[in-house]
Curated annotation (Swiss-Prot):
It is found in: Cell membrane. The lineage of its organism: Bacteria, Bacillati, Actinomycetota, Actinomycetes, Kineosporiales. Keywords: ATP synthesis, Cell membrane, CF(1), Hydrogen ion transport, Ion transport, Membrane, Transport. This is ATP synthase subunit delta. The gene is atpH. HAMAP family: ATP_synth_delta_bact (MF_01416).
Length: 276
């Protein structure tokens, strides 16, 4: 995830692969934490092999051929969820090999965040990652120790784990270890700050922004939250704003989804039809 993903091809490919990951992790018995660890391992494998990156991003090879190569190489070595995610990544189009590595790392973080969500640690994960990033940034000695590439990766990972022992969730420790041991050209504190944004995005997806013409009662908010939770398959928190201009009805936004049932919108649509 070091560096920005290409805004065009890479962004679309990442989004498609994340859908595959989400579906895989929704399966009964799927281990999101282990899947994240496996995807981090694949990221390291891609980073260490220019030939592998080129093979999986070669536009002259079909997506099916690249998918078969991934299955032949990694089947049985990583979780089924990680395997299908890497297959989706390899089958997609990429502008550069680095984009593939960045996307794989991003989805590794998403998998760990998913595990934190399931464990009820999502809020703690965001806070703990942020605080640890600030601790590292504020300590030149610690910052230099975690940036020392002459030290073995395992030693830097162990240092991060010791600092968080008994003070943080397992998912925080997992991500801190990875950030500390990463050799991807970005300091640990900067990686952690990027990953805080991934957690924040996941938390944002769990919030329904509701605009109503009049205030909702507590009972109405609870019913709305329950309905949305059933629809999205996860707990939804309702944030309510009041806008009398809506006249009646609700406008609900959850992530990129917008459900507009306001009377003002219906009236506007009716006017457009009449004018057309």
């Amino acid at each position: 995830m070091s560096g920005e993903l290409d805004a065009g091809v890479a962004k679309a490919s990442l989004a498609a692969a994340q859908q595959v990951l989400d579906v895989q992790l929704s399966a009964e018995g799927a281990d999101a934490g282990k899947t994240g660890e496996d995807l981090f391992a694949v990221t390291s494998l891609l980073d260490s092999s220019v030939g592998l990156r080129r093979a999986l991003t070669d536009p002259s090879r079909s997506g099916a051929a690249k998918a078969e190569f991934v299955r032949r190489t990694l089947s049985g070595r990583i979780t089924p969820a990680a395997l299908e995610t890497v297959v989706a990544l390899a089958s997609a189009r990429w502008a550069a090999g680095r984009d593939l590595s960045d996307a794989t790392e991003r989805l590794a973080v998403v998998a760990v965040v998913t595990q934190a969500e399931r464990s009820g640690h999502l809020d703690a994960l965001e806070d703990e990652l942020f605080r640890f990033a600030r601790t590292v940034a504020g300590s030149p000695a610690l910052r230099d120790a975690l940036a020392d590439r002459t030290a073995p990766d395992a030693n830097r990972a162990s240092l991060a784990a010791r600092l968080l022992l008994g003070k943080a969730s397992p998912e925080t420790v997992q991500l801190a270890r990875r950030a500390a041991s990463s050799s991807r050209g970005m300091r640990a504190e900067r990686l952690l700050e990027e990953w805080v944004e991934v957690v924040a995005k996941r938390r944002e997806q769990l919030v329904a922004h509701v605009v109503s013409a009049t205030p909702l009662t507590d009972a109405q908010r609870e019913r709305l939250a329950a309905t949305l939770s059933r629809q999205y398959g996860r707990a939804i928190r309702v944030n309510l704003d009041v806008d009398p201009h809506l006249v009646g009805g609700l406008r609900v936004s959850v992530g990129d989804d917008v459900i507009d049932g306001s009377i003002s919108t219906r009236l506007d649509e009716a006017r457009r039809r009449l004018a057309g």
